[in-house]
Amino acid sequence: MKVAVVVALLCFVCYTAAETCSADGDCKNTICDASHDLECHRGQCTCVNHATACSSAADCSGSCTIFGRHGRWHCVDAKCRCFFV
């Protein structure tokens, strides 16, 4: 029974994990809207708004869509980036 729980937990973690990458071209499953660019950032596929700079989390409010699911905007390296939560 414990093995079944562990396997189920591992399947859930793998299912919810973000798409990993080493270059922008590796991001095949991440889809950004027209006003954002797809970018591989620190090994994770993200959507980024290159036109808008940020200095705090308050500058990047609201939700976004990544992998067809809802994510949240975060201010990382002075850019608003969409990350899966």
Swiss-Prot record:
Disulfide bond recorded as keyword: yes
GO MF, one term, reads: serine-type endopeptidase inhibitor activity
Q: Which UniProt keywords apply?
A: Disulfide bond, Protease inhibitor, Secreted, Serine protease inhibitor, Signal
Protein localization: Secreted
On modification after translation, the UniProt record reads: Contains 6 disulfide bonds.
Tissue distribution is: Detected in hemolymph (at protein level). Within the digestive gland expression is limited to the basophil cells of the digestive diverticula.
So which domain of life are we looking at?
Eukaryota
Task: Say if the entry is tagged with keyword tRNA processing.
Answer: no
Q: Where is the signal peptide?
A: 1-18
Q: Which GO terms describe its cellular component?
A: extracellular region
Q: What does this protein do?
A: Slow-binding inhibitor of serine proteases. The inhibitor rapidly binds to the protease forming a weak enzyme-inhibitor complex, and this is followed by a slow isomerization forming a tight-binding enzyme-inhibitor complex. Active against subtilisin A with a dissociation constant of 0.18 nM. Active against perkinsin. Not active against thermolysin, papain or pepsin.
What name does this protein carry? Answer: Serine protease inhibitor Cvsi-2
Source species, please?
Crassostrea virginica (Eastern oyster)
Q: Which gene encodes it?
A: CVSI2
